[in-house]
Amino acid sequence: MPRPVLLIHGGAGDIPDSRIAGKFKGIKEALRCAWGSLVPASGAKGGALDAVETAVRSMELDENFNAGYGSCLNTDGQVEMEASLMEGQDLRAGCVTLLRDVMHPITVARRLMEKQRHTFIGGEAAQELALSTGSERLPANALVTEGARFTLQQFKEQLTQGKDPFFARTELAAEQKTDPSGETVGAVAMDHNGQIVVGTSTGGITGKWPGRIGDTPILGSGTYADNARGGVSTTGHGETIMRYNLAQRILAAIEHKGMSAQAAADQECREMTRRIGGTGGAIVVGHAGDLGISFTSQRMAWGYIQDDTIFYGIEGQVVHQEPLS
Protein backbone atom coordinates (compact mmCIF):
# COMPACT_ATOMS: atom_id res chain seq x y z
CA MET A 1 0.00 0.00 0.00
CA PRO A 2 1.50 3.39 -1.00
CA ARG A 3 2.49 5.81 1.73
CA PRO A 4 0.48 9.07 1.53
CA VAL A 5 2.45 12.04 0.25
CA LEU A 6 1.59 15.75 0.16
CA LEU A 7 3.96 18.24 -1.49
CA ILE A 8 3.11 21.90 -2.14
CA HIS A 9 4.69 25.06 -3.52
CA GLY A 10 4.04 28.76 -3.04
CA GLY A 11 5.62 30.10 -6.19
CA ALA A 12 9.00 30.68 -7.83
CA GLY A 13 10.60 34.06 -8.47
CA ASP A 14 12.87 36.78 -7.12
CA ILE A 15 11.32 36.68 -3.66
CA PRO A 16 12.76 39.32 -1.28
CA ASP A 17 13.92 38.47 2.25
CA SER A 18 11.05 40.49 3.72
CA ARG A 19 8.52 38.00 2.39
CA ILE A 20 10.12 34.73 3.45
CA ALA A 21 8.43 34.56 6.86
CA GLY A 22 4.98 35.05 5.32
CA LYS A 23 5.69 32.37 2.74
CA PHE A 24 6.78 29.86 5.38
CA LYS A 25 3.76 30.58 7.55
CA GLY A 26 1.38 30.06 4.63
CA ILE A 27 3.10 26.87 3.47
CA LYS A 28 2.96 25.29 6.91
CA GLU A 29 -0.65 26.30 7.46
CA ALA A 30 -1.71 24.83 4.11
CA LEU A 31 0.06 21.54 4.86
CA ARG A 32 -1.55 21.22 8.27
CA CYS A 33 -5.00 22.05 6.88
CA ALA A 34 -4.72 19.49 4.10
CA TRP A 35 -3.00 16.61 5.88
CA GLY A 36 -6.17 15.68 7.74
CA SER A 37 -7.92 15.15 4.40
CA LEU A 38 -5.15 12.85 3.20
CA VAL A 39 -4.56 10.99 6.48
CA PRO A 40 -7.68 11.27 8.69
CA ALA A 41 -7.08 11.03 12.44
CA SER A 42 -9.62 8.20 12.67
CA GLY A 43 -7.35 5.99 10.59
CA ALA A 44 -9.78 5.90 7.68
CA LYS A 45 -8.30 6.20 4.22
CA GLY A 46 -8.11 9.78 3.04
CA GLY A 47 -8.23 11.14 -0.47
CA ALA A 48 -5.66 12.94 -2.57
CA LEU A 49 -8.33 15.03 -4.29
CA ASP A 50 -9.63 16.56 -1.07
CA ALA A 51 -6.09 17.12 0.20
CA VAL A 52 -4.99 18.99 -2.91
CA GLU A 53 -8.09 21.17 -3.02
CA THR A 54 -7.77 21.98 0.70
CA ALA A 55 -4.10 22.92 0.43
CA VAL A 56 -4.65 25.18 -2.56
CA ARG A 57 -7.74 26.79 -1.02
CA SER A 58 -5.69 27.65 2.07
CA MET A 59 -3.11 29.45 -0.05
CA GLU A 60 -5.80 31.19 -2.12
CA LEU A 61 -6.94 32.86 1.11
CA ASP A 62 -3.43 34.09 1.95
CA GLU A 63 -2.18 37.35 0.46
CA ASN A 64 1.39 36.03 0.66
CA PHE A 65 0.60 34.06 -2.49
CA ASN A 66 -0.51 35.03 -5.98
CA ALA A 67 -3.79 33.11 -6.04
CA GLY A 68 -7.25 34.16 -4.93
CA TYR A 69 -6.88 37.02 -2.44
CA GLY A 70 -3.70 38.90 -3.26
CA SER A 71 -3.57 37.98 -6.94
CA CYS A 72 -1.51 40.09 -9.33
CA LEU A 73 -3.26 42.79 -11.36
CA ASN A 74 -3.53 43.21 -15.10
CA THR A 75 -2.90 46.55 -16.83
CA ASP A 76 -6.47 47.63 -16.02
CA GLY A 77 -5.89 47.03 -12.31
CA GLN A 78 -8.15 43.97 -12.23
CA VAL A 79 -7.71 40.41 -10.96
CA GLU A 80 -8.11 37.63 -13.52
CA MET A 81 -7.43 34.16 -12.10
CA GLU A 82 -6.95 30.65 -13.42
CA ALA A 83 -6.60 27.16 -12.01
CA SER A 84 -6.41 23.51 -12.98
CA LEU A 85 -6.99 20.21 -11.23
CA MET A 86 -6.21 16.70 -12.51
CA GLU A 87 -6.59 13.11 -11.30
CA GLY A 88 -4.06 10.50 -12.33
CA GLN A 89 -6.23 7.39 -12.58
CA ASP A 90 -8.72 8.28 -15.31
CA LEU A 91 -6.89 11.47 -16.36
CA ARG A 92 -9.94 13.56 -15.49
CA ALA A 93 -9.26 17.28 -15.34
CA GLY A 94 -10.87 20.67 -14.89
CA CYS A 95 -9.23 23.89 -16.11
CA VAL A 96 -10.63 27.41 -15.72
CA THR A 97 -9.30 30.82 -16.68
CA LEU A 98 -10.17 34.53 -16.64
CA LEU A 99 -12.18 34.21 -13.42
CA ARG A 100 -13.06 37.37 -11.51
CA ASP A 101 -14.54 38.15 -8.11
CA VAL A 102 -14.64 34.60 -6.72
CA MET A 103 -12.40 33.38 -3.92
CA HIS A 104 -11.46 29.83 -4.90
CA PRO A 105 -10.66 29.10 -8.57
CA ILE A 106 -9.40 25.63 -7.59
CA THR A 107 -12.88 24.68 -6.39
CA VAL A 108 -14.41 25.90 -9.65
CA ALA A 109 -11.91 23.68 -11.48
CA ARG A 110 -13.00 20.71 -9.37
CA ARG A 111 -16.68 21.35 -10.11
CA LEU A 112 -15.89 21.44 -13.81
CA MET A 113 -13.96 18.18 -13.60
CA GLU A 114 -16.58 16.32 -11.60
CA LYS A 115 -19.89 17.61 -12.92
CA GLN A 116 -19.50 19.00 -16.43
CA ARG A 117 -18.76 17.61 -19.89
CA HIS A 118 -15.98 20.04 -20.77
CA THR A 119 -12.40 20.11 -19.52
CA PHE A 120 -11.37 23.74 -20.09
CA ILE A 121 -13.54 26.87 -20.00
CA GLY A 122 -12.79 30.54 -19.54
CA GLY A 123 -14.20 34.02 -19.21
CA GLU A 124 -17.98 34.32 -19.02
CA ALA A 125 -18.49 30.55 -19.12
CA ALA A 126 -16.15 30.00 -16.19
CA GLN A 127 -17.76 32.85 -14.30
CA GLU A 128 -21.24 31.43 -14.88
CA LEU A 129 -20.13 27.97 -13.75
CA ALA A 130 -18.63 29.39 -10.57
CA LEU A 131 -21.73 31.36 -9.60
CA SER A 132 -24.21 28.65 -10.60
CA THR A 133 -22.45 25.97 -8.55
CA GLY A 134 -22.11 27.74 -5.24
CA SER A 135 -19.31 30.30 -5.45
CA GLU A 136 -20.13 33.66 -3.90
CA ARG A 137 -19.81 36.72 -6.12
CA LEU A 138 -17.47 39.00 -4.20
CA PRO A 139 -17.71 42.79 -4.31
CA ALA A 140 -15.64 44.40 -7.05
CA ASN A 141 -11.95 44.64 -6.08
CA ALA A 142 -12.43 42.48 -2.97
CA LEU A 143 -9.45 40.37 -4.05
CA VAL A 144 -7.19 43.37 -4.66
CA THR A 145 -4.58 44.09 -1.99
CA GLU A 146 -2.51 47.21 -1.43
CA GLY A 147 0.54 45.15 -2.23
CA ALA A 148 -0.83 44.23 -5.64
CA ARG A 149 -1.68 47.87 -6.36
CA PHE A 150 1.83 48.93 -5.37
CA THR A 151 3.40 46.34 -7.63
CA LEU A 152 1.29 47.42 -10.60
CA GLN A 153 2.32 51.01 -9.95
CA GLN A 154 5.97 49.93 -10.02
CA PHE A 155 5.36 48.07 -13.25
CA LYS A 156 3.84 51.12 -14.94
CA GLU A 157 6.65 53.37 -13.71
CA GLN A 158 9.19 51.04 -15.29
CA LEU A 159 7.27 51.14 -18.57
CA THR A 160 7.60 54.93 -18.64
CA GLN A 161 11.37 54.45 -18.23
CA GLY A 162 11.48 52.25 -21.32
CA LYS A 163 11.72 48.95 -19.41
CA ASP A 164 9.13 46.18 -19.59
CA PRO A 165 9.46 43.98 -16.48
CA PHE A 166 7.14 41.44 -18.10
CA PHE A 167 10.14 40.31 -20.11
CA ALA A 168 12.34 39.79 -17.04
CA ARG A 169 11.36 36.13 -17.51
CA THR A 170 10.70 35.44 -13.88
CA GLU A 171 7.28 35.37 -12.30
CA LEU A 172 8.40 38.36 -10.23
CA ALA A 173 10.56 40.82 -12.10
CA ALA A 174 14.01 41.33 -10.62
CA GLU A 175 13.51 45.09 -10.22
CA GLN A 176 10.46 44.58 -8.03
CA LYS A 177 12.36 43.53 -4.91
CA THR A 178 9.79 45.13 -2.63
CA ASP A 179 6.90 43.38 -4.30
CA PRO A 180 4.47 42.31 -1.57
CA SER A 181 2.33 40.20 -3.89
CA GLY A 182 2.88 36.47 -4.12
CA GLU A 183 3.41 33.70 -6.62
CA THR A 184 1.46 30.81 -8.13
CA VAL A 185 0.50 27.99 -5.74
CA GLY A 186 0.27 24.26 -6.33
CA ALA A 187 -0.10 20.90 -4.63
CA VAL A 188 0.61 17.27 -5.51
CA ALA A 189 -0.70 14.39 -3.41
CA MET A 190 -0.69 10.60 -3.48
CA ASP A 191 -3.12 8.72 -1.23
CA HIS A 192 -3.26 5.19 0.20
CA ASN A 193 -4.74 3.92 -3.07
CA GLY A 194 -1.92 5.28 -5.19
CA GLN A 195 -4.18 7.96 -6.64
CA ILE A 196 -2.18 11.03 -7.67
CA VAL A 197 -3.88 14.43 -7.86
CA VAL A 198 -2.38 17.78 -8.86
CA GLY A 199 -3.82 21.27 -8.49
CA THR A 200 -2.40 24.68 -9.44
CA SER A 201 -3.88 28.17 -9.01
CA THR A 202 -2.66 31.66 -9.89
CA GLY A 203 -3.46 35.29 -10.49
CA GLY A 204 -0.97 35.39 -13.36
CA ILE A 205 1.69 38.05 -13.67
CA THR A 206 1.64 41.76 -12.86
CA GLY A 207 0.97 43.99 -15.85
CA LYS A 208 -0.42 41.27 -18.10
CA TRP A 209 -2.89 42.25 -20.80
CA PRO A 210 -6.55 41.65 -19.93
CA GLY A 211 -7.41 38.22 -21.30
CA ARG A 212 -3.87 36.85 -21.05
CA ILE A 213 -3.77 33.13 -20.22
CA GLY A 214 -0.71 31.55 -18.65
CA ASP A 215 0.62 28.06 -18.12
CA THR A 216 -1.38 27.25 -14.97
CA PRO A 217 -4.63 26.01 -16.62
CA ILE A 218 -2.84 24.24 -19.46
CA LEU A 219 -2.45 20.49 -18.96
CA GLY A 220 1.13 19.42 -19.53
CA SER A 221 2.51 22.88 -18.83
CA GLY A 222 1.30 23.98 -15.41
CA THR A 223 -0.33 20.76 -14.21
CA TYR A 224 -0.36 17.07 -15.00
CA ALA A 225 -1.22 13.85 -13.13
CA ASP A 226 -0.81 10.26 -14.27
CA ASN A 227 -0.74 7.41 -11.77
CA ALA A 228 1.58 5.46 -14.06
CA ARG A 229 4.21 8.22 -14.06
CA GLY A 230 3.59 10.83 -11.38
CA GLY A 231 2.23 14.31 -10.79
CA VAL A 232 3.71 17.77 -11.45
CA SER A 233 2.75 21.34 -10.58
CA THR A 234 4.89 24.13 -12.03
CA THR A 235 5.47 27.80 -11.30
CA GLY A 236 7.49 30.63 -12.79
CA HIS A 237 7.49 32.61 -16.04
CA GLY A 238 4.33 31.34 -17.69
CA GLU A 239 5.24 32.06 -21.30
CA THR A 240 8.46 30.09 -20.86
CA ILE A 241 6.74 27.14 -19.17
CA MET A 242 4.07 26.97 -21.89
CA ARG A 243 6.64 26.95 -24.67
CA TYR A 244 8.62 24.18 -23.00
CA ASN A 245 5.64 22.12 -21.80
CA LEU A 246 7.47 21.64 -18.50
CA ALA A 247 5.14 19.31 -16.58
CA GLN A 248 4.85 16.82 -19.43
CA ARG A 249 8.59 16.83 -20.11
CA ILE A 250 9.33 15.97 -16.47
CA LEU A 251 6.93 13.03 -16.57
CA ALA A 252 8.37 11.88 -19.90
CA ALA A 253 11.84 11.79 -18.32
CA ILE A 254 10.47 9.62 -15.50
CA GLU A 255 8.70 7.29 -17.93
CA HIS A 256 11.20 6.94 -20.76
CA LYS A 257 14.54 7.49 -19.01
CA GLY A 258 13.75 5.82 -15.69
CA MET A 259 14.69 8.97 -13.79
CA SER A 260 13.70 9.71 -10.22
CA ALA A 261 11.30 12.59 -9.61
CA GLN A 262 14.18 14.76 -8.40
CA ALA A 263 16.50 13.99 -11.31
CA ALA A 264 13.75 14.57 -13.87
CA ALA A 265 12.73 17.88 -12.30
CA ASP A 266 16.34 19.09 -12.13
CA GLN A 267 17.08 18.13 -15.72
CA GLU A 268 13.99 19.67 -17.28
CA CYS A 269 13.97 22.90 -15.25
CA ARG A 270 17.61 23.51 -16.19
CA GLU A 271 17.04 22.63 -19.84
CA MET A 272 14.00 24.91 -20.03
CA THR A 273 16.01 27.86 -18.77
CA ARG A 274 18.98 27.02 -21.01
CA ARG A 275 16.86 26.84 -24.16
CA ILE A 276 14.39 29.65 -23.58
CA GLY A 277 15.94 31.84 -20.91
CA GLY A 278 12.98 32.10 -18.55
CA THR A 279 13.08 30.72 -15.03
CA GLY A 280 10.68 28.59 -13.05
CA GLY A 281 10.28 25.57 -10.87
CA ALA A 282 8.33 22.39 -10.28
CA ILE A 283 7.25 20.01 -7.57
CA VAL A 284 6.92 16.34 -8.47
CA VAL A 285 5.62 13.17 -6.88
CA GLY A 286 6.75 10.10 -8.80
CA HIS A 287 4.58 7.02 -9.23
CA ALA A 288 6.65 5.28 -6.54
CA GLY A 289 6.04 8.13 -4.09
CA ASP A 290 9.46 9.78 -4.41
CA LEU A 291 9.63 13.58 -4.38
CA GLY A 292 11.20 16.17 -6.65
CA ILE A 293 11.67 19.87 -5.87
CA SER A 294 13.58 22.00 -8.36
CA PHE A 295 13.78 25.60 -9.54
CA THR A 296 16.01 27.85 -11.64
CA SER A 297 14.59 31.07 -10.20
CA GLN A 298 16.22 32.78 -7.24
CA ARG A 299 13.79 31.18 -4.80
CA MET A 300 10.75 28.92 -4.62
CA ALA A 301 8.68 28.30 -1.49
CA TRP A 302 7.87 24.62 -0.92
CA GLY A 303 6.92 22.17 1.80
CA TYR A 304 5.91 18.57 2.43
CA ILE A 305 4.98 16.23 5.27
CA GLN A 306 6.81 13.01 6.02
CA ASP A 307 6.99 10.91 9.21
CA ASP A 308 4.87 13.41 11.18
CA THR A 309 7.31 16.19 10.31
CA ILE A 310 6.90 19.27 8.13
CA PHE A 311 9.87 19.94 5.86
CA TYR A 312 10.00 23.30 4.08
CA GLY A 313 12.35 25.69 2.33
CA ILE A 314 12.73 28.48 -0.17
CA GLU A 315 16.32 28.56 -1.47
CA GLY A 316 19.15 26.24 -2.41
CA GLN A 317 19.56 23.10 -0.34
CA VAL A 318 18.45 24.72 2.92
CA VAL A 319 15.74 22.60 4.54
CA HIS A 320 13.84 23.56 7.69
CA GLN A 321 11.69 21.20 9.71
CA GLU A 322 9.28 21.14 12.62
CA PRO A 323 6.84 18.63 14.15
CA LEU A 324 3.49 18.31 12.43
CA SER A 325 1.51 18.43 15.66
From Swiss-Prot:
Pfam families: Asparaginase_2. Has both L-asparaginase and beta-aspartyl peptidase activity. Does not have aspartylglucosaminidase activity and is inactive toward GlcNAc-L-Asn. Likewise, has no activity toward glutamine. One of its GO terms (biological process) is proteolysis. The active site is at T184. Its EC number is 3.4.19.5, 3.5.1.1. It is an enzyme of class 3 (hydrolase). Keywords: Autocatalytic cleavage, Hydrolase, Protease. It comes from Drosophila pseudoobscura pseudoobscura (Fruit fly). It catalyses: L-asparagine + H2O = L-aspartate + NH4(+); Cleavage of a beta-linked Asp residue from the N-terminus of a polypeptide. Cleaved into an alpha and beta chain by autocatalysis; this activates the enzyme. The N-terminal residue of the beta subunit is responsible for the nucleophile hydrolase activity. PANTHER family: ISOASPARTYL PEPTIDASE_L-ASPARAGINASE (PTHR10188:SF41), L-ASPARAGINASE (PTHR10188). The keyword Hydrolase applies. It comes from the Eukaryota. The keyword Hydrolase applies. GO terms for cellular component: cytoplasm. This is Probable isoaspartyl peptidase/L-asparaginase GA20639. One of its GO terms (molecular function) is beta-aspartyl-peptidase activity. Heterodimer of an alpha and beta chain produced by autocleavage. Substrate binds at R212, I213, G214, D215, T235, G236, H237, G238.
